[in-house]
Amino acid sequence: MSVPLRFSTPSSSPSASDNESVHDDGPTTELDTFNTTDVPRRVNTTKARQMRPKNTLKVAFSSPNLKGLDNTADSDSQPWLGGYLAGRLEDISGQSRRNYVDPYYEELNAGRRPNKPVWSLNGPLPHVLGNSVVEKISQKNQEARSRANSRVNSRANSRANSSVSLAGMDGSPNWKRKMKSAVFGSRVKLNDEEAQLPRNKSSVSIAEQAASRPKVSFSLQSSRQPSIAEEQPQTQRKSSAITVEHAENAEPETPRNNVSFSRKPSIAEQDSSQDITMPPNEIIAEESLDSGSDTETLYLNYWCKIRHFFREGFAEFLGTLVLVVFGVGSNLQATVTNGAGGSFESLSFAWGFGCMLGVYIAGGISGGHVNPAVTISLAIFRKFPWYKVPIYIFFQIWGAFFGGALAYGYHWSSITEFEGGKDIRTPATGGCLYTNPKPYVTWRNAFFDEFIGTAVLVGCLFAILDDTNSPPTQGMTAFIVGLLIAAIGMALGYQTSFTLNPARDLGPRMFAWWIGYGPHSFHLYHWWWTWGAWGGTIGGGIAGGLIYDLVIFTGPESPLNYPDNGFIDKKVHQITAKFEKEEEVENLEKTDSPIENN
């Protein structure tokens, strides 16, 4: 393993000034060095040496196999480029280290997901508006903009006509240039280096300020980041535009061995380099068919294509399977050992940690709901797509089915010993797979036990996942969700075994009926699994989300906070008023631009 060492090393530049080294306590060495404060882009060697600032920390690796790794790319501007040092420089500079990615890995990975929201239990929930609200806002905004455009164009035409008439009276347009210079400030064409220097706020014209402000508009199309194939033509067009604009003041490029730059190279300098390695166009794969591209999606193999369309369902399946393996396994272990293998507190923590691991497994793909009550609550109050709800529930049930099967198979010998034979199966061990209220609990009490427990679960989840409240640190949400499950189990779970999750009950119950416990597992406690395990949990989840949104949440994605027509009209009026001012300034500049060029 190579260890970074601090040395005072001479530069490899032929310039005399570059041979100066940074004095340090350590010895000198002839190993290749690299700069940790300003890593240039992947350009030619001469330009890379020119762009290094002097008197900076130099770091060398003791291993000779790491020589010649200086030409690493700027990972912030071109993340698809890379090298060995792309992941190590951030460690040396004291910042968090990003994972290394091979230059061609991202392009070959056809499973890249587009920029879509993920309703994850391991991070803040996305803020998404309903289609009806977006269509209403877009329609009103389009109508207001059309009216504003007509008014602005009429004003611009009237000013243009008056300008032509005045220019005809006076053959010299100098007075117009002076008036515009007094109002908007003088315009001076700058070269590429001067244009990037900071300017005083007073020297920026009103038109430039208006152009720098972002335009506010509404669109029904989903936003996504452009691919490399789409970004390259824009870079070339931008580079050509800069070259034409500064052609008059451009100076010939000469070697600057004694000059160090503290800025990043401009677009023109980037394009002038011939050593930038671009991946071949043949292997560039579009993100997804859902991203709006007409190019067919490429897949590594046939299974990758199947997984691409069912990835969210598979994630819910696997996350729920892990949840049930830990939970049902702890139930069976405590039962067959007559309490020696676990207590009620250990069972609660087992279910909580199982839920935590399930969320970590599926959180970045499907959200890690692992619970139909949570999925339905998110669809009602957080705009989770309704067409995904049955898909999620289907995979959650079957994940619980196979999770119960794995736990049962693991404890099969102990269950047989506990029951007294391999053909004997009683509700004593069957109750470890599915839930049932205690015999003395009334049906009203049993129902409201599940109702209240799931309401607390969903209400606390909405609070934890609300980034406008006090969300946990990134990556810690799933751990807190696990603690929440354990706390509910220890405080509100004794009378009904804290179902809280319809899939967790139905999946193992189906397996119990299939393995030999018989249909009696469905008939227990007057078909408890229908009105208790499903009705009580789903109703409680909806109630918990309703209470949180009623008293705390203010986002417009909740049905309790839908914007009415009056709010939309006022908001659109504010936007169009700002739009009119910006368009008026831009049209005034366009009208007077030919006169300035004269």
Swiss-Prot record:
<keyword id="KW-0472">Membrane</keyword>
<feature type="compositionally biased region" description="Polar residues">
    <location>
        <begin position="218"/>
        <end position="242"/>
    </location>
</feature>
<dbReference type="Pfam" id="PF00230">
    <property type="entry name" value="MIP"/>
</dbReference>
<feature type="transmembrane region" description="Helical">
    <location>
        <begin position="314"/>
        <end position="334"/>
    </location>
</feature>
<feature type="transmembrane region" description="Helical">
    <location>
        <begin position="389"/>
        <end position="409"/>
    </location>
</feature>
<dbReference type="GO" id="GO:0015254">
    <property type="term" value="F:glycerol channel activity"/>
</dbReference>
<feature type="compositionally biased region" description="Low complexity">
    <location>
        <begin position="1"/>
        <end position="19"/>
    </location>
</feature>
<dbReference type="InterPro" id="IPR022357">
    <property type="entry name" value="MIP_CS"/>
</dbReference>
<feature type="short sequence motif" description="NPA 1">
    <location>
        <begin position="371"/>
        <end position="373"/>
    </location>
</feature>
<feature type="topological domain" description="Cytoplasmic">
    <location>
        <begin position="554"/>
        <end position="598"/>
    </location>
</feature>
<feature type="transmembrane region" description="Helical">
    <location>
        <begin position="533"/>
        <end position="553"/>
    </location>
</feature>
<feature type="compositionally biased region" description="Polar residues">
    <location>
        <begin position="30"/>
        <end position="48"/>
    </location>
</feature>
<feature type="topological domain" description="Cytoplasmic">
    <location>
        <begin position="368"/>
        <end position="388"/>
    </location>
</feature>
<feature type="topological domain" description="Cytoplasmic">
    <location>
        <begin position="1"/>
        <end position="313"/>
    </location>
</feature>
<comment type="similarity">
    <text>Belongs to the MIP/aquaporin (TC 1.A.8) family.</text>
</comment>
<dbReference type="GO" id="GO:0015250">
    <property type="term" value="F:water channel activity"/>
</dbReference>
<feature type="compositionally biased region" description="Polar residues">
    <location>
        <begin position="255"/>
        <end position="276"/>
    </location>
</feature>
<dbReference type="GO" id="GO:0006833">
    <property type="term" value="P:water transport"/>
</dbReference>
<feature type="short sequence motif" description="NPA 2">
    <location>
        <begin position="501"/>
        <end position="503"/>
    </location>
</feature>
<feature type="transmembrane region" description="Helical">
    <location>
        <begin position="445"/>
        <end position="465"/>
    </location>
</feature>
<feature type="topological domain" description="Extracellular">
    <location>
        <begin position="495"/>
        <end position="532"/>
    </location>
</feature>
<protein>
    <recommendedName>
        <fullName>Uncharacterized membrane protein C977.17</fullName>
    </recommendedName>
</protein>
<feature type="compositionally biased region" description="Low complexity">
    <location>
        <begin position="147"/>
        <end position="165"/>
    </location>
</feature>
<keyword id="KW-0813">Transport</keyword>
<feature type="transmembrane region" description="Helical">
    <location>
        <begin position="474"/>
        <end position="494"/>
    </location>
</feature>
<keyword id="KW-0812">Transmembrane</keyword>
<dbReference type="GO" id="GO:0005886">
    <property type="term" value="C:plasma membrane"/>
</dbReference>
<dbReference type="InterPro" id="IPR050363">
    <property type="entry name" value="MIP/Aquaporin"/>
</dbReference>
<feature type="region of interest" description="Disordered">
    <location>
        <begin position="139"/>
        <end position="176"/>
    </location>
</feature>
<keyword id="KW-1133">Transmembrane helix</keyword>
<feature type="topological domain" description="Extracellular">
    <location>
        <begin position="410"/>
        <end position="444"/>
    </location>
</feature>
<feature type="transmembrane region" description="Helical">
    <location>
        <begin position="347"/>
        <end position="367"/>
    </location>
</feature>
<feature type="region of interest" description="Disordered">
    <location>
        <begin position="194"/>
        <end position="279"/>
    </location>
</feature>
<dbReference type="InterPro" id="IPR023271">
    <property type="entry name" value="Aquaporin-like"/>
</dbReference>
<feature type="topological domain" description="Extracellular">
    <location>
        <begin position="335"/>
        <end position="346"/>
    </location>
</feature>
<feature type="region of interest" description="Disordered">
    <location>
        <begin position="1"/>
        <end position="54"/>
    </location>
</feature>
<dbReference type="InterPro" id="IPR000425">
    <property type="entry name" value="MIP"/>
</dbReference>
<keyword id="KW-0677">Repeat</keyword>
<dbReference type="GO" id="GO:0015793">
    <property type="term" value="P:glycerol transmembrane transport"/>
</dbReference>
<feature type="topological domain" description="Cytoplasmic">
    <location>
        <begin position="466"/>
        <end position="473"/>
    </location>
</feature>
